[in-house]
A protein has these predicted regions:
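Short terminal alpha-helical segments
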Residues: 1-28, 81-88
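Amphipathic alpha-helical binding modules
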Residues: 53-91
Length: 91
């Protein structure tokens, strides 16, 4: 699996989790990045890195559903988020 394949796979899984938590806005942002990663790696790298800075960033996201924090999903999402950061940085 190439880095781009892995990035696409990670983005798919992150989108699935986000949609389950009714976070369509975030899912759509990640889907847009997935669409560009094969065609414009420079822009994809910039978009991935920009997810991680400032207030309200992807780093600040905590997953809840029906008012209950999703511990397992947050753990999985955190692993995916960290892996995406490192792969994006290497693009």
């Amino acid at each position: 699996m190439t880095n781009i394949d892995e990035i696409e796979s990670i983005l798919d899984e992150m989108c699935r989790i986000l949609k389950e938590c009714n976070l369509e806005r975030w899912a759509n942002i990640l889907l847009d990045i997935k669409k560009m990663v094969r065609h414009d790696t420079k822009e994809a790298r910039y978009s991935i890195m920009s997810l991680y800075g400032g207030m309200g960033s992807l780093n600040d996201l905590v997953l809840f559903k029906d008012g209950v924090m999703l511990v397992e999903e947050n753990d999985v999402f955190d692993e995916l988020r960290n892996r995406l950061y490192h792969l994006g940085k290497a693009l």
